[in-house]
C-alpha cells in the first residue's frame, strides 16, 4: 500500500488553522523542518523518550517551574497525611482523624453534591451520590478484593486495612520470594548500559500496563530532596508485620512490627533497606528511581463524581499490580527494588522532574500525553543503573497562566486563584521553595474530580481528535500567543464538558479498560 504524502508549508499549515499572521515567526523559529504532514505527526524526540517533536527537553532538575534549591527541601509531612491530620510532627493516628484542617467527609460530600445538583439540574445522585444503582455497582466492583481473594486479598495484592478500595503490594517494599529463583537464593546481575536498562524497563512496564515512564538519579542531592523526611515504613496499617527480603528473593525475613508513628527516612551505606522504631534506611547504593504513570478512563472521568469514581479506583488497584510486577522484574535481574506506591514523596513532584509532565494550575502534574487524566508517578527505588530522563517543556505550565477552566469549575475554590504562579501558598502543607501553582487540598473530596475532567489537555489525544488538535499541541509548546484563543475554542467546542449523564456510557461499546486507543 502506498503512503500518501502531501507537501505543505508552515504558512499554509497556519492558514488552515486560521492563525496565519502574528506569531508565525515564533513557531517557525523553534520548530524543526518537516517536508510533509506525515513526517510531522509521526516524528519523535528521541529513541528513549517516545514524545513528539514539540516536547522540548530541559536540563536535569530544571523543570518549567522555578526552583530555589537553597530553600526547597524534603517535605516533612509524610504520605500527604499532614493535610488530614494536623501539624507535620503529629504522630500517625488514623485515616479518620481529619477534622483539624478540613471539614468532615459527610459535610464535604453534601457540599459537593449540592454544587453538582446546581450545576446539573435534574441530576439524581442516588443513594451514595454517584448516580443510579449501576453506578454504585461499578464502584463496588472495582473497590473489592480481586475475585476469589476473600478477606486476605489475592496473590501479590491486598486491600489497605483502613482504606477501602485501595490495594498495596502485600509483600511490602521488596516483593515476595520467587519460585523460579536459583535454589541458593542468588541471581546473577543483568549487565546493561543505563540507557539500555531504561529502554528495557520501559518495555516491561508498558507491557505490564504502565501509561508513561521516567527515571531520576537518586545520587543527585537535588533528587534526594524529593524524598519525604519521614514516613511510616511500608504502606501497611500500623502495628502489622511485613515479609521482606533481599534481591535473592528466597531469603525473606519477618521484620519488626511497623511503628505506629512516623520515623525519619535516612540514606546510609547498607546491604539492605531496613527499619526500626528510630529510622528507616535506604541504601546509598540504590541510585536510581524508576517512575511510571497510569491514565484514567477519559469517558468515565467526564462523568465527574458519578461513575468517574470507579475509573479513579481502578487505577489505584492497578498501581499495586503494575508496581509489583516491575519490582519482581527488577529483582530477577539481580537488583534491589524498593516499591512504595505513594510513600516516597509527592507524586506530581516526580512527574514534573522525570519528564512525564509539567505542573498545572491544579498543583498536580499534566502529562504530555494523557493530560490531567492520569495518576502517578509511582516510584521504584533500585540499584539497577538507569539513565535519568530530563524535565520537559511542552508549553503546558505557561498555558495554565491564561486558562482558568479548572479554577472556574472547582467547587471548593481550592484551585490556584491568581493568574501567576506564586512562591508561597500560605498553607503549611505545601512544599516551599518553588515558583508554581498552589492548591488548597484541604477542601478537596473524592466525590469531585472536576478539575481533572475539564482540563483541555486531557482530550487533545483522544481517538476522535483531528489533525488540528495535534497541531494545537505543537503551537502551544512553541508560543503563548494563541493560548487565550485555544482556551476559548475549548469552551466553545466543549471537548471537556462535564456531565452527570451516565445512560449513554452503559450503551456504548467502550475501549479496553476504558482507555481510548487514540492516546
UniProtKB/Swiss-Prot annotation:
Predicted to be exported by the Tat system. The position of the signal peptide cleavage has been experimentally proven. Pfam families: Dehalogenase. It is found in: Cell membrane. Its cofactor is [4Fe-4S] cluster; corrinoid. It is an enzyme of class 1 (oxidoreductase). Residues 388-420, 435-465 form the 4Fe-4S ferredoxin-type domain. Binds 2 [4Fe-4S] clusters. This is Chloroethene reductive dehalogenase. It comes from Dehalococcoides mccartyi (strain VS). The gene is vcrA.
Amino acid at each position: 500500500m502506498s503512503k500518501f504524502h502531501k507537501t505543505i508549508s508552515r504558512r499554509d499549515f497556519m492558514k488552515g488553522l486560521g492563525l496565519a499572521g502574528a506569531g508565525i515567526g515564533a513557531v517557525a523559529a523553534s520548530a524543526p523542518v518537516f517536508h510533509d504532514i506525515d513526517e510531522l505527526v509521526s516524528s519523535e524526540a528521541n529513541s528513549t523518550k517516545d514524545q513528539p517533536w514539540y516536547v522540548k527537553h530541559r536540563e536535569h532538575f530544571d523543570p518549567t517551574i522555578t526552583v530555589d534549591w537553597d530553600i526547597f527541601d524534603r517535605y516533612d509531612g509524610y504520605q500527604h497525611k499532614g493535610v488530614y491530620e494536623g501539624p507535620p510532627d503529629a504522630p500517625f493516628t488514623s485515616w479518620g482523624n481529619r477534622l483539624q484542617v478540613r471539614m468532615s467527609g459527610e459535610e464535604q460530600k453534601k457540599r459537593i453534591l449540592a454544587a453538582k445538583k446546581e450545576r446539573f439540574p435534574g441530576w439524581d445522585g442516588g443513594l451514595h451520590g454517584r448516580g443510579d444503582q449501576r453506578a454504585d455497582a461499578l464502584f463496588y466492583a472495582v473497590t473489592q478484593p480481586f475475585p476469589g481473594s476473600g478477606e486476605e486479598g489475592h496473590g501479590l495484592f491486598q486491600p489497605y486495612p483502613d482504606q477501602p478500595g485501595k490495594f498495596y503490594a502485600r509483600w511490602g517494599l521488596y516483593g515476595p520470594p520467587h519460585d523460579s529463583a536459583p535454589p541458593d537464593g542468588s541471581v546473577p546481575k543483568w549487565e546493561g548500559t543505563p540507557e539500555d536498562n531504561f529502554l528495557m524497563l520501559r518495555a516491561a512496564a508498558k507491557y505490564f500496563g504502565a501509561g508513561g515512564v521516567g527515571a531520576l538519579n537518586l545520587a543527585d542531592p537535588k533528587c534526594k530532596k524529593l524524598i519525604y523526611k519521614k514516613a511510616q515504613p511500608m504502606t501497611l496499617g500500623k502495628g502489622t508485620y511485613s515479609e521482606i527480603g533481599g534481591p535473592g528473593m528466597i531469603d525473606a525475613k519477618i521484620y519488626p512490627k511497623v511503628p505506629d508513628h512516623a520515623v525519619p527516612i535516612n540514606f546510609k551505606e547498607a546491604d539492605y533497606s531496613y527499619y526500626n522504631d528510630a529510622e528507616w534506611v535506604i541504601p546509598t547504593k540504590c541510585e536510581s528511581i524508576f517512575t511510571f504513570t497510569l491514565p484514567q478512563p477519559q469517558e468515565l472521568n467526564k462523568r465527574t463524581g458519578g461513575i468517574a469514581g470507579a475509573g479513579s479506583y481502578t487505577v489505584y488497584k492497578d498501581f499495586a499490580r503494575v508496581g509489583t510486577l516491575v519490582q519482581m522484574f527488577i529483582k530477577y535481574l539481580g537488583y534491589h527494588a524498593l516499591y512504595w506506591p505513594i510513600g516516597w514523596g509527592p507524586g506530581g513532584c516526580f512527574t514534573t522532574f522525570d519528564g512525564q509532565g509539567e505542573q498545572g494550575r491544579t498543583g498536580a502534574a499534566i502529562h504530555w500525553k494523557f493530560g490531567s487524566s492520569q495518576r502517578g508517578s509511582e516510584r521504584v527505588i533500585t540499584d539497577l543503573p538507569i539513565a535519568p530522563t530530563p524535565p520537559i517543556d511542552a508549553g503546558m505550565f505557561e498555558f495554565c497562566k491564561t486558562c482558568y477552566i479548572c479554577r472556574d469549575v472547582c467547587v471548593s475554590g481550592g484551585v490556584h486563584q491568581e493568574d501567576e504562579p506564586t512562591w508561597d501558598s500560605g498553607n503549611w502543607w505545601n512544599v516551599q521553595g518553588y515558583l508554581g501553582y498552589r492548591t488548597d487540598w484541604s477542601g478537596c473530596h473524592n466525590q469531585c474530580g472536576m478539575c481533572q475532567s475539564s482540563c483541555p489537555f486531557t482530550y487533545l489525544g483522544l481517538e476522535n481528535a483531528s489533525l488540528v488538535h495535534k497541531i494545537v499541541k505543537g503551537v502551544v509548546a512553541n508560543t503563548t500567543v494563541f493560548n487565550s484563543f485555544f482556551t476559548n475554542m475549548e469552551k466553545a467546542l466543549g471537548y471537556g464538558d462535564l456531565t452527570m449523564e451516565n445512560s449513554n456510557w452503559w450503551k456504548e461499546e467502550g475501549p479496553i479498560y476504558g482507555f481510548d486507543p487514540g492516546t
